[in-house]
Design a protein with these regions (language model features):
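Alpha-helical transmembrane segments and their immediate juxtamembrane cytosolic regions
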Residues: 3-12, 17-414
C-alpha cells in the first residue's frame, strides 16, 4: 500500500520539472541545478540504507572509499546555506539574514525535539518492555542518568544519543552560520577558512578532549564524552565552512568548479582509486594501526577530506554522465531534505525494534522495512517539497515564488 501511494504521488507530482527550474522571489539571478538536489536526495537514500539494520548495510557503508553519506550531506547542506543566505545578506542585510537562518534552525530544533520525545517516551518504553538490546544501547545514558537529566541535557544539545547525534551538529552549524557570513563579508573568507582549518587541525590532536576536560573541571559538565555524539564538531565544522564558502562563491557566479575539475581529474582519479583499494584491503584484514586516525570518520581525518575532494572532482568533471541520475524521486527527496532527513530516523528506530536480539534483520521483514521506509519518505517529500520551494525568501515578502522550467539552471528574480 505504501509503495502504491508513493508511486502515485510520484506520477502526479507536477511541480518538479524534468529540467532545471526557475524560481522567483529572492531578487537577482541564481541558478539551481536539479542534479544537486538529486545529489542531496541520493545522500539521504545512502544514509538511510546505512542506518537501517539490514543485510545490505555492510555493503553500503563507505563503498566508494573513505567517504560516507555524512560528508556529502553536510557539504551540500552548507553549500545551499551559503548560497541562499549570502544573497539574503547582500539584499536584505544582516538582520534579515540572521532571522531567516534562526527560523530555519528553530524548525530543525522542533523536529529534533519531536524525535527526542519519540525516543524517550516510545522507544525507551519498548526497549525495556521488549528487552530489546539494540534500542536499549542507543539510550543507555537515558536509563543510567534518569529521564529528567537526560531530557534536559538533550534539549540543551549536550546529550546526543546515537543516530540522532548529527542533528545537534547540523543545528549548531546553522546557528553559527550568520556570524560566519557576516565575518566573511567584513574580513574576507581567507581568514575564516584559515581559522576553520586551524580548528580542524587542533581536532586531529585532541582539541575536543582537552576542551571537554576543561568544561568538566570548571563548568561542572557531568556527561560522558561519548554521550555527546560520535561526530567531532571541531573537525566537522571545516566541512561546513568549506561548503558555505563554495555556496557564497556560487551565489556570486564566482565558482569555476568545472575548470578546476578539468585540471585535476587525472590525479583525482588516481587518488580515488588508491584509497578505494586501501579501503577494501582494510576490510580484508589490513591493519592501519597508528595510521587509523588519518582515515577516521568521526574526526574527519585528512584522507577523508582528500577522498571527498577527489570524488567531487570526478563527479563535476563527468557530470554529463551522472546528470541522468537526477531522477524525480531523488530530486523530490533533496528538495525536502530537512524533513526527509528527520523522518528517516523514525524508521531506524523501527528497524532496531525489529532486530530483537540479533545484529540485523533477516528475511522478508528487511524488504518490507526498506519498501515502507522509502515509500513513506517519498510521501514526506511530496508534502514538504512544494513548501520548501515556495517559501518566501525576502523580508516582508508575502508573495509566493513562481516556478518556471528553463533549459538550464534556475533564476530567482523579484
Amino acid at each position: 500500500m505504501f509503495a502504491w501511494v508513493s508511486l502515485s504521488l510520484w506520477r502526479d507530482e507536477t511541480n518538479i520539472p524534468t529540467g532545471d527550474i526557475k524560481e522567483t522571489g529572492l531578487g537577482g539571478s541564481v541558478k539551481r541545478r536539479l542534479e544537486i538536489d538529486a545529489a542531496r536526495g541520493l545522500m539521504l537514500v545512502w544514509m538511510t540504507l546505512t542506518h537501517l539494520p539490514t543485510l545490505i548495510t555492510p555493503w553500503v557503508n563507505q563503498p566508494f572509499g573513505y567517504i560516507s553519506a555524512s560528508e556529502g550531506f553536510i557539504f551540500l547542506s552548507a553549500l545551499f546555506t551559503g548560497r541562499i543566505y549570502f544573497r539574503l545578506l547582500e539584499r536584505d542585510g544582516a538582520g534579515a539574514m540572521t532571522w531567516k537562518l534562526f527560523l530555519r534552525a528553530l524548525k530543525l530544533y522542533r523536529y529534533h525535539v519531536v524525535l527526542l520525545f519519540v525516543a524517550f517516551l516510545v522507544v525507551a518504553r519498548f526497549a525495556i518492555s521488549g528487552h530489546n538490546q539494540g534500542l536499549y544501547n542507543i539510550l543507555d545514558f537515558y536509563f543510567a542518568a534518569g529521564p529528567a537529566r537526560a531530557i534536559a541535557d538533550a534539549l540543551l544539545l549536550v546529550y546526543r544519543p546515537p543516530l540522532l547525534d548529527i542533528i545537534p551538529l547540523y543545528l549548531i552549524f546553522l546557528l553559527l552560520s550568520p556570524l560566519t557570513l557576516i565575518a566573511a563579508a567584513k574580513i574576507g573568507w581567507r581568514y575564516i577558512l584559515g581559522a576553520s582549518f586551524a580548528i580542524w587541525l587542533g581536532a586531529q590532536f585532541g582539541l575536543r578532549q582537552a576542551l571537554y576536560a576543561l568544561a568538566a573541571r570548571h563548568l561542572g559538565l557531568h556527561i560522558p564524552l561519548n554521550e555527546m555524539g560520535a561526530f567531532n564538531l571541531w573537525a566537522w565544522q571545516f566541512m561546513w565552512i568549506l561548503g558555505m564558502w563554495c555556496g557564497a562563491r556560487w551565489a556570486k557566479d564566482d565558482l569555476p568548479v568545472e575548470k578546476w575539475a578539468r585540471k585535476v581529474w587525472i590525479p583525482a582519479a588516481l587518488v580515488a582509486a588508491t584509497l578505494l583499494a586501501v579501503r577494501y584491503t582494510e576490510l580484508r584484514g589490513l591493519n592501519l594501526a597508528g595510521w587509523s586516525g588519518l582515515f577516521d570518520k568521526w574526526h574527519l581525518g585528512v584522507f577523508r577530506l582528500i577522498n571527498f575532494a577527489a570524488i567531487a572532482a570526478l563527479l563535476v568533471r563527468f557530470q554529463s554522465v551522472v546528470k541522468p541520475l537526477a531522477v524525480r524521486p531523488l530530486v523530490l527527496l533533496g528538495q525536502a531534505s530537512l524533513q526527509v532527513f528527520c523522518a528517516h530516523f523514525v524508521f531506524c528506530f523501527v528497524g532496531l525494534g525489529l532486530m530483537g536480539g540479533g545484529d540485523r534483520i533477516f528475511g522478508w521483514p528487511q524488504l518490507a522495512l526498506v519498501v515502507c521506509t522509502f515509500a513513506s519518505l517519498l510521501v514526506v517529500a511530496k508534502v514538504f517539497a512544494r513548501q520548501e520551494l515556495n517559501a518566501p525568501q525576502t523580508r516582508g515578502s508575502n508573495a509566493r515564488p513562481t516556478v518556471k522550467a528553463t533549459a538550464r539552471g534556475y533564476s530567482q528574480a523579484s
